[in-house]
Amino acid sequence: VIMLLIFVQRGIFPFGEETFLRTDMYHQYAPFFSEFQYKLTHGGSLLYSWDVGMGVNFSALYAYYLASPFNWLLILCPKGLVIEFMTYQIVLKIGLCGLSMAYYLRKHCRTNDFGIAFFGIFYALSGYMAAYSWNIMWLDCIILFPLIVLGLERLVKDGKGMLYCLA
């Protein structure tokens, strides 16, 4: 909800003409996402691509830029809406950042206090997120960090490593 209010205030798509396309997101990530979407919908090799630059090792590109499970939703995305997909994905990931931090705080502090939601929001809308949210592939790490810490705490305290291994 907070992100939607910011979108309205700043005129960011779908409430205006502005987008998250900045620096590398415009020059690199959007073409990578478009190529990945094309490969998913038209069946192409995920090993190599002649359509990016002068040809690239697509498996290496996938490993660094596209390996997020969220990116497989591109198979449902029409070709002309890849940039919009990326914008919605950023909003989704920022929301999941707040949710994972709130979950961590709830389990770590053993409370259901309403204030935990605020700290989840603070985490999701931190300065780092404001400055680097266009680095879409790194947002998964910000989502997983509280879960990794919680998993590590459970591993050390209780000898249970399932969450740590999954995160």
Regions picked out by a protein language model, each given a short descriptive name:
Residues 2-101, 121-143:
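Membrane-interface coil-to-helix junctions
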Residues 88, 117-121, 162-166:
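Hydrophobic alpha-helical transmembrane segments
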Residues 148-163:
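Membrane-interface transmembrane helices that cradle and orient dolichyl/undecaprenyl
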Residues 128, 135-136, 159-167:
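Transmembrane helices and adjacent periplasmic/lumenal helix-loop junctions
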Residues 102-124:
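Transmembrane-helix signature of polytopic, membrane-embedded enzymes
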Residues 74, 102-106, 153, 157:
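Membrane-water interface at transmembrane helix exits
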